[in-house]
Amino acid sequence: MTLESMIACCLSDEVKESKRINAEIEKQLRRDKRDARRELKLLLLGTGESGKSTFIKQMRIIHGAGYSEEDKRGFTKLVYQNIFTAMQAVVRAMDTLKIRYKYEQNKANALLIREVDVEKVTTFEHQYVNAIKTLWSDPGVQECYDRRREFQLSDSAKYYLTDVDRIATVGYLPTQQDVLRVRVPTTGIIEYPFDLENIIFRMVDVGGQRSERRKWIHCFENVTSIMFLVALSEYDQVLVESDNENRMEESKALFRTIITYPWFQHSSVILFLNKKDLLEDKILHSHLVDYFPEFDGPQRDAQAAREFILKMFVDLNPDSDKIIYSHFTCATDTENIRFVFAAVKDTILQLNLKEYNLV
């Protein structure tokens, strides 16, 4: 073989190898592009306690592995802590609101509960069970509970406090509903990916309290949809961080900011008006017009109230071409969320698959 033919042979091998490598790179780039298309990022936003974390739990139940017995057991301590936190809040409010206990022994029970360091609670001992049950049955405490908009109390307080006997049993294992009702403030960012119809939905939950919001900024890239939660029942409540600011006004201000962000010009917006069950209960004795004087609908009418609240939020949208998709929800009701998210999923897929030419 001549030198020239040897060089030509080597060169052709190099060219072949170079082509093979290029083909591999092209293939990987196509794969990466396809995978990026297959992942949709859903950003879950809303003020503190609007129901975002509960919504994520529902996604795990409906579209993920759910909660095993071992997972549920991991919530036991948190259920106990939620009960103590709730009763401590009520006991403190009894003093602040100057409400008297009907039963004399409840002064001692209140003192016993106040002295508990909630973060160290891991069990539910007999003396505390009795103290909490006796306190909860006191007409003074019930009067205080009826005035709960005047202090900070978790929405799940009544759910747990009326079921102390079940929770106090030996070998107690939290139910799925117990898990959904547990309140643990979200600090930092929680991501929950789940696979639906060969597309990964990556749901991102960020803390709703003001102090948490500065951590949101890096979540804003490549967001497919904004899912914004509003607690319908917060129309008469004040912020945890500021006791002279209305929670719903804060929610409106945040929503206005979010929908006008340049980052989100190409993201669809889905508005969940959550806690519709709590609104139905509250509207019977707390009048919307007292907090939003522009409301001119009938009193004690949950339908009129929620339609008014929906309009308040939709009217914040300055872009007439941008559709805001809205749903009334109860995040603790698995069947309601299953139904609503099926509709939401279809909306998101239709909007995005067109964009990616996948339909």
Curated annotation (Swiss-Prot):
Residues 329-334 are annotated as: G5 motif. Keywords: Cell membrane, Cytoplasm, GTP-binding, Hydrolase, Lipoprotein, Magnesium, Membrane, Metal-binding, Nucleotide-binding, Palmitate, Transducer. Transmembrane segments: none annotated. GTP binds at residues 46-53, 180-183, 274-277, 331. SUPFAM superfamilies: P-loop containing nucleoside triphosphate hydrolases (SSF52540), Transducin (alpha subunit), insertion domain (SSF47895). Residues 201-210 are annotated as: G3 motif. Its main location: membrane. Mg(2+) binds at residues 53, 186. Residues 41-54 are annotated as: G1 motif. Guanine nucleotide-binding proteins (G proteins) function as transducers downstream of G protein-coupled receptors (GPCRs) in numerous signaling cascades. The alpha chain contains the guanine nucleotide binding site and alternates between an active, GTP-bound state and an inactive, GDP-bound state. Signaling by an activated GPCR promotes GDP release and GTP binding. The alpha subunit has a low GTPase activity that converts bound GTP to GDP, thereby terminating the signal. Both GDP release and GTP hydrolysis are modulated by numerous regulatory proteins. Belongs to the G-alpha family. G(q) subfamily. This is Guanine nucleotide-binding protein subunit alpha-11.
